[in-house]
Structure formats: structure tokens, C-alpha cells
């Protein structure tokens, strides 16, 4: 495939996430303050939509559902996080964010998670 327009860089505020549609593939653009990442729209843990549950602070993306976190600069897994965050190659040209999308990035999910680690569930 080729480079695909995602959005203007100015459309994604610092420390925020924006869900975009790139030729029928949903992508989340993450602005971590000093740069951008293009990632699949769901957390690799439990299929939680990152545009709704993701929070960025100090260059770290955290899914608030189960507190999995990744450093958006190094992509290092933080804390109890068990799976890497997949990313699309991204570049900025003339204020526009473009991703190289050869195929949709997806995760394999395990069915046996019983949600006991759901920090926000009601007991």
C-alpha cells in the first residue's frame, strides 16, 4: 500500500488521542507532546477502545480499564503490561500526518481473562 493521510497534526492536541478512519481502517493518532504515534484503536489487553479509555501523560499511554501502559517514545511496556503496543509507521509532511498502512494491525485476545483485575468494577 502507500502513505495514507490520517489528519492534520494541529487536529490532535498535545497529550490526547484522536480516532480517524484511514481507507476503512480505524487508527488512533496519539500526540504525546513531543511527537505522534499511529496505533490500532483498541487496547491489546481486553479490546477496550483506546480513544475512549486511553490517557496520555508524560509520554506514557495508559488504558484506564486495567492500567496497562506504554512509553510512547520507546514503546517500552510499563508496570504489569504484558503485550506490546503495535504501531503504524508515521510521518509528518507540511503539517499533515501520514501513516504507511500495508494491512490493518490487530491483536490476538485471550478468552480466559475473568476480569478479576478490573480495577474499576463494582464489588
UniProtKB/Swiss-Prot annotation:
One of its GO terms (cellular component) is cytoplasm. GO terms for molecular function: 2 iron, 2 sulfur cluster binding; metal ion binding; methanesulfonate monooxygenase activity. It is found in: Cytoplasm. Binds 1 [2Fe-2S] cluster per subunit. Residues 4-99 form the Rieske domain. Its cofactor is [2Fe-2S] cluster. The keyword Amino-acid biosynthesis does not apply. [2Fe-2S] cluster binds at residues 43, 45, 63, 66. Belongs to the bacterial ring-hydroxylating dioxygenase ferredoxin component family. Methanesulfonate monooxygenase (MSAMO) mediates the primary degradation of methanesulfonic acid (MSA) to produce formaldehyd and inorganic sulfite by initial hydroxylation of the carbon atom prior to spontaneous cleavage of the unstable hydroxymethanesulfonic acid. MSAMO has a restricted substrate range that includes only the short-chain aliphatic sulfonates (methane- to butanesulfonate) and excludes all larger molecules, such as arylsulfonates and aromatic sulfonates. All MSAMO components are required for enzyme activity. This is Methanesulfonate monooxygenase ferredoxin subunit. The gene is msmC.
Amino acid at each position: 500500500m502507500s502513505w495514507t493521510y490520517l489528519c492534520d497534526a494541529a487536529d490532535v492536541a498535545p497529550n490526547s488521542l484522536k480516532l480517524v478512519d484511514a481507507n476503512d481502517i480505524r487508527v488512533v493518532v496519539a500526540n504525546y507532546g513531543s511527537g505522534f504515534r499511529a496505533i490500532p484503536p483498541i487496547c491489546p489487553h481486553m479490546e477496550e477502545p483506546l480513544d475512549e479509555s486511553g490517557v496520555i501523560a508524560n509520554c506514557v499511554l495508559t488504558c484506564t480499564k486495567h492500567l496497562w501502559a506504554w512509553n510512547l517514545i520507546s514503546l517500552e511496556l510499563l508496570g504489569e503490561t504484558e503485550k506490546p503496543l503495535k504501531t503504524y509507521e508515521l510521518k509528518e509532511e507540511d503539517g499533515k500526518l501520514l501513516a504507511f498502512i500495508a494491512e490493518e494491525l490487530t491483536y490476538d485476545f485471550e478468552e480466559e481473562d475473568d476480569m478479576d483485575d478490573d480495577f474499576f468494577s463494582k464489588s
